[in-house]
Amino acid sequence: MKILLISTCREKLSEYEFVKPIVEIIKYFDYDIINYRNLETLDLHIYDKVIICGTSLQDNDYLNYLFDFNRLKNHGKGILGICSGFQIICSMFDEEIIVQEEIGMINVETQIKNPLASGNFQAYNMHNFSVDKVTSFNVLAKSESTIQMISHKNINAFGVSFHPEVRNQDIITNFLLI
């Protein structure tokens, strides 16, 4: 299996916080890391899975490159968006992004049976934006204040608003097993 990690970090130093922990989870697989600013020249078809990593609260530069992510719609294989990656996946399918700051540990309740997680669990959130409602996605899990996990209704695409690399690494592993 070959995995593509897309860094949404403008600054390379931020990747130590948002990409490297995911690398630790997938380190036994074949993987590449690419920055979001280099997506347009990438051959996506060589990858079996794509993970769009998160970034820091002050780093919103990836929002200027949302159009480039639309190529992922036709990837045909698994996509997982984490934090800013969640927002990117929602934007790809014209879902409305809202201002919704969440920082710290939150309680997450699974809404429907899904391959990523089950039951109730705690997760670490650190984001400025989220979605209030979705039409192209199934809501897999919610917190008291917002949607936390989604799956696209027609393609193999998932999003998590929180950072599973912090306390819920099994979500990333489960995604790779789909």
Give the ranges of each region predicted by the language model.
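Amide-donor transfer/coupling interface in amidating biosynthetic enzymes
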Residues: 2-15, 21, 25, 40-45, ...
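Flexible gly/pro-rich beta->alpha loop and the following alpha-helix that scaffold active-site loops
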Residues: 23-81, 93
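Active-site loop->helix "elbow" adjoining a glycine-rich segment at hydrolase catalytic centers
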Residues: 82-86
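Short gly/pro/ser/thr-enriched loop/turn and capping motifs at secondary-structure boundaries
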Residues: 87-88, 106
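Conserved active-site segments centered on acidic
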Residues: 91, 95-98
